[in-house]
Structure formats: structure tokens, C-alpha cells
Amino acid sequence: MVLNLLHLGRIGYAQGLELQRQLVEARHSGRIGNTLLLLEHPPVLTLGRNSERKNVLASDEFLAYRGVEIHEVNRGGDVTYHGPGQLVGYPILDLRSFAESGERGRLGAVEYVRWVEEALIRTCADFGVQTQRVAGRTGVWTLPGGSVEEKKIAAIGVHISRGITSHGFALNVTTDLRDFDLIVPCGISDRKVTSLELEVIDEPALTMEKVIHSAARQFGRVFGHQVLWLESPGDLLPELATLTQS
């Protein structure tokens, strides 16, 4: 099977939501195949279905002053931050296309999240960074060592409707981690966040482009798809040709 891959650069969060909405409908109707969007967002806080507003530590006025948007969305999870230097991925997949891998004729929600985690663990490993899952906590974490506890390097929050996935993951690459001080990331107050840039040892020239290519390759492998790089959303649906243009 083919995984359509779109690298969109940096786009507004509202644009990303609208693009996902249209692609989910197109995937459900069979107009497009499985698709992965890779992109960055300007500074934004998103609150998932399980969010508590107390986990946003900054006032609306301060966020506006800093130019940080805030959106309530229908993904799972609590509050998270997106911003420059962070690779965001939105898989638009029909879980029924993985019928042989799951129960009841499709890949289950928990299995799907584990697969996303696995692709990100392999991506980090491409840069010499060993990561892991942590029981009871979705996402990807560095390994603890000595007195240093594990840190979160990638957050995951998904939505599944009629078997079609949306939302997805955020991998900190060269993210300014000070922006996470605006929130209690994912509602977890006893662990810190980190980035590939801080964790790599033998990759002095770490770039977003390298991480994008690694993530695309690893998602293709984990999900058993051949990756097909596309130039623009219009290559998927003609009506999307101008959606992400400034």
C-alpha cells in the first residue's frame, strides 16, 4: 500500500484543522488513500477532550501578548504546545486498511497509538537517541539514568471517527522548550520535556529536514506502506490547491 506524504512547512493551526477535516472526509469516501501530513505550527496551545484549564498557566492576556493562539480540539489528551522547531504529524488513515493487524477487522485505537509511538522511537534512534514507552503515559520518553528521570520528547493525541484517524503527534526537534512553561504539558507535572537537539550526541548538524525524512521512512516501515512524496495538497484533491498558500 501507498502512504501519501505531504510536507507543508509552517502553517497556521486553523489551516491545519481545515485541511485535516477535508482529508478525513475524502479518506472516508475513498477519494484518497492513507496520508501523512508533516508540518510545523506557529506558537499555539491546544486543549484536548480531557484538558483542564488549570493546566494553562498563563493568562489569555499574556498569551495574546506573546502571540500564542489557543484552540480547543477533539483529540484525546490534555493541553500541549506546538511551535517552531517541532515536527507535527497528522496521519489520515483508514484503520480498516490494517485489518490483518488488528481485531474486529481493523487496527484498534490502542494498537494504533502504539504503532505511532514505535515510528517515533525508531525516528529518534536514527539520531542516536534511545527512547521508550512509559506505562500509563502516552507518548515517547527518553531513558532515565542515575538521578535523571525520563523526559518527554514526543506527545501524541489522536481522534478516530468512522475508522479514520486525525490529529497525531508532536516531536520536539529544535523547539524552544521555554514555551512549555506556559502549561503543564499533557497535564503531567512531575516530568520535564526535552528535544532531539538536547539529546543527540553524535549529530552536530541536526536539521528539521533530516528528521522529516527519517520520520517519513519510519512511518512507512511501521505501517507497512511505501511512502509517496507529494508536492502540495492539490496533488491529493484539486480543491485543496490553495488552502495552505499564504
From Swiss-Prot:
Substrate binds at residues 75-82, 155-157, 168-170. Pfam families: LplA-B_cat. Keywords: Acyltransferase, Cytoplasm, Transferase. It catalyses: octanoyl-[ACP] + L-lysyl-[protein] = N(6)-octanoyl-L-lysyl-[protein] + holo-[ACP] + H(+). GO terms for biological process: protein modification process. The record marks 152 as: Lowers pKa of active site Cys. It is found in: Cytoplasm. GO terms for molecular function: lipoyl(octanoyl) transferase activity. Its EC number is 2.3.1.181. Belongs to the LipB family. This is Octanoyltransferase. It comes from Acidobacterium capsulatum (strain ATCC 51196 / DSM 11244 / BCRC 80197 / JCM 7670 / NBRC 15755 / NCIMB 13165 / 161). The gene is lipB.
